Amino acid sequence: MPFLSSMDYRKGPHTKYLIEYHFVWVTKYRYHVLKGDVALRLRELVRQSCEMMEIHILRGVVSKDHVHMLVSAPPQWSPSEIMRRLKGRSARKLFEEFPRLKKRYWGRHLWARGYFCVTSGSLTQEMVAQYLEHHFERRSDDQFDVEP
């Protein structure tokens, strides 16, 4: 999905809005566990969760120890609730599907506490997109990449 312009407001039953967040969250201890099948599955889980919440992923990157996402969210979802759901569901599912992660994270916490969030009003979409575009060499036409 291309970036929304200021004229491309989203609509709800009683609202018209354009709310965009740039999120970053990291693995506990910054371990490089988001590789291969784990990274691909994480991307799919995040996409599913966002779809359930009607959140549009404008751009994203799964790196080895962190995730960046620029999203457009409906007004009923606060940044803290978005992160609670994305981090919680993804950790639960990844631990179920990849038992080797349980050995690395014996305390059952895949993600470090906290996250970074900024509205795209503070950082322009172009600044975030440029950072994500140059974060690594892009290999696909997909808007949500997995770092090699």
List PLM regions with ranges.
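Basic nucleic-acid-binding interfaces
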Residues: 1-148
